Amino acid sequence: MAENSADTVSPLVVKVGGSLAETGRMPAALSLIAATRVPVVVVPGGGPFADSIRALQPTMKFGEALAHRLAMLAMHQMAELIVVQNDRFSVVQSLAEISDAVRDGKVPVWAPLRMIAGDAAVPAGWMATS
């Protein structure tokens, strides 16, 4: 997916933050994304689900590693909400699924947990997740 050649085009990665849901602008943004013919991968923010994790972390006293994992689950929840907005959207959890979705004319919406949980190259903290 990351390689470029005359036969392949790397998709544009678009972060759809939770603030779009809170301001009511998400449907319009998703309509624009769904209408594009440029290959796109949507990375959802965790939105209100991630906000809940942030609020619970100090009172429930869980560490950054668990907060990171829960934030990825929050991103998955937002992915599920995004895909019901348009038939072109499809939840994906691997590079192969991303490639398949793009090939099939779908807009992949990435749920990151399966790909990056436990990956030492990805910092387990709020800077890396929603």
Language-model-detected regions and their locations in the chain:
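Nucleotide/pyrophosphate-binding catalytic subdomain
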Residues: M1-S130
